[in-house]
Amino acid sequence: MKYTQLGRTGLKVSRLVLGTMNFGPQTDEADSHAIMDAALDAGINFFDTANVYGWGENKGRTEEIIGNWFAKGGDRRDKVVLATKVYGNMGADGEAWPNHDKLSALNIRRAVDASLKRLQTDHIDLYQFHHIDRDTPFDEIWQAIDVLVQQGKILYAGSSNFPGYKIAQANETAARRGGGIGLVSEQCLYNLFERRAEMEVIPAAQDYGLGVIPWSPLHGGLLGGVLKKQAEGGRRASGRAADTLADPAARARLQAYEDLLDKHGLEPGEVALAWLLTRPGVTGPIVGPRTAGQLESALRAVELEPSGELLDALDEVFPGPGPSPEAFAW
């Protein structure tokens, strides 16, 4: 496994991040533990979760599965850089109470303590704001975070799904307040198919020294060779993926992508991950395997070094959004 520093911090993390959103809803506890064991054995030390994972009436279940894995003992917790998130309402669907969501000081304090209990640990290494909060000022958010850092309950703060201007606002507020270092990471939707983060999120993250952690690196499986798999009788796409495949232009791009990689004898999913590892500012993509076999495929991507010729060809199939935000600067 290869490692890098998380943004401007001294924290060393693996270039693949183990995503755990499937733990509970799609992968049972025993298989989830097996995946975490395999990831740790392979050198992945960066695990990502969220308080709402488990979803519906089972919100928090994913953190519980991870906590039970830590409780097995050994040096599991000491080896893992643990990241979780706060924002979503933790009440059962249809039973949401005020002050049990978003980023108020009250909810942050409550959410941290609840996550620590489920995770069976005394601290969270990276505590991420799962979404922007349009109602709570950053002065209040940072006041709550500063207390938690002083208490040793969290070490670093990060963002998720933030626009560039909110990254700037958050860190300028932290700098004005003094003391804390502000956001150190941004977790965003970013992959070959969806490159809008290059317009202003990633430039802002780089300017403020945030490590970029892409989620959905295969764009819901579309970059994993979906057309070939469907032709061979594989699982049919659903939801947004099905909507994308119904678009003739999108389908043509995916076909060109699969044809290109077939010509090079490469696996689409591995190339999609390897491409992200070449991108400026990227710490590592989140991979969310449902099985140990899917994890093995992701691990191969770390050793794959796409040629300049291949990277240029990928840009032709999936062009970036352009020179924004400095399109007219000189």
Each language-model region and where it sits:
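N-terminal binding-site loop/beta-alpha segment at the start of enzyme catalytic domains
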Residues: 1-80, 150
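N-terminal small/glycine-rich loop or linker at the start of catalytic domains
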Residues: 7-23, 83-99, 123, 128
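Short acidic capping loops at alpha-helix termini that bridge into adjacent secondary structure
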Residues: 14-15, 76-80, 122-126, 155-156, ...
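Active-site mouth loops of central-metabolism enzymes
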Residues: 20-30, 94-109, 130-136
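Short, acidic/polar
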Residues: 27-39, 104-119, 167-172
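Structural motif
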Residues: 38, 42, 118-119, 152, ...
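Active-site groove signature of glycoside hydrolases
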Residues: 116-136
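Beta/alpha (TIM)-barrel catalytic core signal, keyed to glycine-rich beta->alpha loops juxtaposed to Asp/Glu
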Residues: 132, 136-317, 330
